[in-house]
Amino acid sequence: MARKSLIQRERKRQKLEQKYHLIRRSSKKEISKVPSLSDKWEIHGKLQSSPRNSAPTRLHRRCFLTGRPGANYRYFGLSGHILREMVHACLLPGATRSSW
């Protein structure tokens, strides 16, 4: 299980990303439309003044049960070893174990 502080940090990043999403998107569109370089630098400076954690690249997918950051299946939102345990316990409908 991941430390609670890491999970809270990730939630804080998600909230910041949602808050600044429209601002960042509109700034990027402005940069592509403005022809002069000096205006682009001004808009870029405004974009750089937004919080670092508001960038979507700072987000990381985590298992919603354990908070584990690696080996996540997007469809289930679970990490690999939790997914395997749940499939073996028949807790995920429609998921079957592979056997050959």
Curated annotation (Swiss-Prot):
Q: Which InterPro entries has this protein been placed in?
A: Ribosomal_uS14, Ribosomal_uS14_bac/plastid, Ribosomal_uS14_CS
Q: PROSITE patterns under this entry?
A: RIBOSOMAL_S14 (PS00527)
Q: Where in the cell is it found?
A: Plastid, Chloroplast
Keyword list (alphabetical) reads:
Chloroplast, Plastid, Ribonucleoprotein, Ribosomal protein, RNA-binding, rRNA-binding
What domain of life does the native source organism fall in?
Eukaryota
Q: Does the keyword rRNA-binding apply?
A: yes
- Chief localization: plastid
Q: Name one GO cellular component term.
A: chloroplast
Q: Does the keyword Methyltransferase apply?
A: no
Which one GO biological process term can you cite for this protein? Answer: translation
Ranges in coiled-coil conformation: none
Pfam families linked to this entry: Ribosomal_S14
Q: List the disulfide bonds.
A: none
Q: Which family does it belong to?
A: Belongs to the universal ribosomal protein uS14 family.
Quaternary structure and partners: Part of the 30S ribosomal subunit.
Functionally, this protein is described as follows: Binds 16S rRNA, required for the assembly of 30S particles.
Tell me what this protein is called.
Small ribosomal subunit protein uS14c
